[in-house]
Each structure stands twice: as structure tokens, then as C-alpha cells.
């Protein structure tokens, strides 16, 4: 029985962010490919000069109030307790990827208020 693309997308949509990351790593190893975008020539450098519109929220350190940071990660990402704890314990770790500046700033503020050290990339 062969799965349709829609069934595959639906199944992936039901996974947590960490489960999707693990799936991507497994696919990279199985098929010998990477999910990285190939670098373009000089045109890519010109695009970098433009204002950045999407940001990644990187948790660099959990700080003293780890429980509060786990709660903040859960609220921001919708992850379960176990997954959020894994993100916090695995610091430095990506909390949110490719979000708008406003959302990234709010996430950074919430995490810093909880006691974490955060970087926007």
C-alpha cells in the first residue's frame, strides 16, 4: 500500500517539532542528502544586505530558573513537557525558526523574563 503525499503531510503535521527534526536527520542519513539549501553565487550576498524579515530564536542558556524557562518554551512552541524539557536541557537549542521580527522579539522577551539567555539569528 502506497501513501499519498497528502497522507504523508498529514502524518508529519501531527508530530512535534523535535520529532520532525529527528525525522529529517533520519532521512538525511538514509538517503545520503542534506536539508541545507545550496549556496547561490553573488546574488545571495546581495540579498543578505536587505533587511532580515525572518528570525530564529536560539536558547543559549537556561539560567537559574529552569522550570520557568520550560514553561515559557511550552507556551511559545506548543511542545509537551518532555519535549520542552529536552529543548531546555539541550541548550544551546533552536526554540523557533523563521518567525517574524515581532514574534521573535516577543519570544525573546518571554524567555528572558523566565530567566533564559536568548539570541535572535
UniProtKB/Swiss-Prot annotation:
Listed name of the protein: Large ribosomal subunit protein bL12
InterPro entries: Ribosomal_bL12, Ribosomal_bL12_C, Ribosomal_bL12_C/ClpS-like, Ribosomal_bL12_oligo, Ribosomal_bL12_oligo_N_sf
Gene Ontology CC: one annotated term: cytosolic large ribosomal subunit
HAMAP family cross-referenced by the UniProt entry: Ribosomal_bL12 (MF_00368)
Assembly and oligomerization: Homodimer. Part of the ribosomal stalk of the 50S ribosomal subunit. Forms a multimeric L10(L12)X complex, where L10 forms an elongated spine to which 2 to 4 L12 dimers bind in a sequential fashion. Binds GTP-bound translation factors.
Alphabetized GO MF terms: mRNA binding; structural constituent of ribosome
Pfam families reported in the protein's UniProt record: Ribosomal_L12, Ribosomal_L12_N
GO BP terms, alphabetized: translation
Function text: Forms part of the ribosomal stalk which helps the ribosome interact with GTP-bound translation factors. Is thus essential for accurate translation.
Keywords, comma-separated and alphabetical: Ribonucleoprotein, Ribosomal protein
Amino acid at each position: 500500500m502506497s501513501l499519498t503525499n497528502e497522507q504523508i503531510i498529514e502524518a508529519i503535521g501531527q508530530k512535534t517539532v523535535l520529532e520532525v527534526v529527528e525525522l529529517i536527520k533520519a532521512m538525511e542519513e538514509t538517503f545520503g542528502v542534506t536539508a541545507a539549501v545550496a549556496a547561490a553565487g553573488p546574488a545571495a550576498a546581495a540579498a543578505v544586505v536587505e533587511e532580515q524579515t525572518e528570525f530564529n530564536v536560539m536558547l543559549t542558556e537556561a539560567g537559574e530558573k529552569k522550570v520557568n524557562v520550560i514553561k515559557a518554551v511550552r507556551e511559545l512552541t506548543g511542545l509537551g513537557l518532555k519535549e520542552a524539557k529536552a529543548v531546555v536541557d539541550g541548550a544551546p537549542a533552536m526554540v523557533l525558526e523563521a518567525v517574524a521580527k515581532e514574534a521573535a522579539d516577543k519570544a525573546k522577551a518571554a524567555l528572558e523574563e523566565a530567566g533564559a539567555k536568548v539570541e535572535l539569528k
